[in-house]
A protein has these predicted regions:
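Extended, Lys/Arg-rich, non-catalytic nucleic-acid recognition/anchoring regions
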Residues: 1
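Generic low-complexity segments that are intrinsically disordered, proline-rich and/or Lys/Arg-biased
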Residues: 13-16, 73, 97, 113
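Extracellular disulfide-bonded cysteine-rich modules/repeats
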Residues: 116-126
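Sequence/structural signature of small/polar-enriched beta-strand/turn repeats
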Residues: 114-117, 136-137
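Terminal beta-strand-rich extracellular "head" domains
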Residues: 98-115
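Exposed extracellular interaction/assembly regions and N-terminal maturation sites
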Residues: 31-99, 103, 126-138
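Collagen/collagen-like triple-helix recognition
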Residues: 5-35
Length: 138
């Protein structure tokens, strides 16, 4: 059995409840200066000292003679990294600037060398004036 109501109208729609809080949205920080494009600094001499502009870039070294790459003091901060590559025949040896410590698995841990032409490595600053060298080193 069904019942039908004649003359019944629908009442007004009730008010909508309050919208729940979504929480404050934090401020957006400034855009960083990092780029996804790797810069290349080509060096052709027999000595080079890293500079802050080498940060997050690739320093290539190409010379027929031996090359000394110096890690200077008080330039880089913890978590900074620089990539290096030996393009020429001259073997690249890393040297500690005054007060700098280099750690590596190289035969001379504090003065590692790139193993051969086309070898590469990363230099990572792990603390003030302290660097870890990882890669194709001798």
């Amino acid at each position: 059995m069904s019942i039908s109501l004649i003359g019944v109208t629908t009442g007004p729609t009730g008010p909508t409840g309050a919208t729940g809080a979504t929480g404050a949205t934090g401020a957006t920080g400034a855009t960083g200066s990092s780029s996804s494009v790797l810069g290349i600094n080509t060096q052709t001499g027999t000595t080079y000292t890293l500079v802050i502009g080498d940060l997050n870039d690739l320093v290539t070294m190409s010379n027929a003679g031996a090359i000394t790459l110096t890690l200077p003091p008080s330039v880089f901060s913890a978590n900074d990294a620089i990539n290096i590559a030996q393009i020429g025949a001259g073997q690249v040896t890393l040297a500690q600037g005054a007060g700098v410590t280099i750690n590596s698995t190289g035969a001379t841990a504090t003065a590692p060398k790139l193993r051969a032409q086309y070898s590469s490595a990363s230099i990572i600053c792990t603390a003030s004036n302290t660097f870890l060298v990882v890669g194709d080193i001798a």
